[in-house]
């Protein structure tokens, strides 16, 4: 029926708005609370051998944190499910992992001529699911983390979680 369709569309639009709000909250938090870190939502250029990239999508990061020679690219994810089931086993969303890996490797290549360390993080809003991804992987010389941010707590605890990410990554 129309009412069911409207509800589904509204739920979808609300989820899109929440996702964007989640991304902006994290970005603005780091801008305000860590002025020594450059926090932006930078585009990452494709590193093409032939220079032909007309049909390639723009690589737009949600959050890119830079401090000295370290860069952390954060892809903020606000989903109702932080994992997907594949053959009866909980797995990370493969598209998300491919995306952050692509961002990191292209940024790494862009900075090849200067000292740098590029890492990536998928930062999911924590859900009530039993399995909560909090892992770290080393892929082709880069650290890729998957973390959750618990939003169902006092703001001081949310701030502490975000602070830990910056402090651990940038040795602050």
Question: Language-model features: where?
Answer:
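Interdomain/boundary linker segments immediately adjacent to catalytic/signaling cores
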Residues: 1-19
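Catalytic core segments in nucleotide and nucleic-acid processing enzymes
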Residues: 15-172
